[in-house]
Amino acid sequence: MLAIYKKEVKSYFTTMTGYVFIAFLALVVGYVFYMINVKSSYAWIGKTLEYSYVSIVFMILVPVMTMKVFADERHTKTDQMLFTAPVTVGQIVWGKYLAILTVFLVNVLIICMYPLFMADYGEIPFLASYSAIGGFFLMGAVYFAVGLFISSITENQIISAVVTFAVILLSFMMQYMTGIVPSKPMPTAVVTAVFFVILAV
């Protein structure tokens, strides 16, 4: 697993993929942080991380990062080399997953410095801020896992990216969809059934 992890991390930083992901996400989060926390003197960084611009960029970057992790290897048939190597399927998956989380962790560590920067200008809710950052990391970990799973069941990178984007978009929309779900059991069951039928189609 360690060999796969090192290989994947190296591939992200010997190409532009890792650098573009880190730079683009850091740029957007940094801009929103400046506008909300610095310019508007808002102490809690969680407001920055839940902002729509950050969410939209995240929805785009995650599919781009995960679309070729397994799909490209299935398409080029190089996945057979992995499966014949002296490692288990679980070790392959974990190696690739931890590698992509390592790239994301660079952004999280950058964000961790923002509350410290704000501390020079007033009282900062550090516990709430770092809890929000931890939640942001866990959210990213879930979405990357979803992206890797979808990449593993298709050979087409575009399909992998589109489906991953759709799943993440749907998860973001869930909080707005709760208002249209009826409170009574039977109508709720009907709405839920229709929802899953649409997903199946």
Language-model-derived ranges and their functions:
Residues 65-83, 97:
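Transmembrane helix boundary and interhelical loop/hinge segments in multi-pass membrane proteins
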Residues 157-201:
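Transmembrane helix segments
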Residues 29-36, 40-57, 94-95, 99-164, ...:
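Secretory targeting signals
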Residues 58-64, 140-144, 193-201:
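Hydrophobic cores of alpha-helical transmembrane segments in multi-pass inner/ER membrane proteins
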Residues 1-72:
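Hydrophobic alpha-helical transmembrane segments
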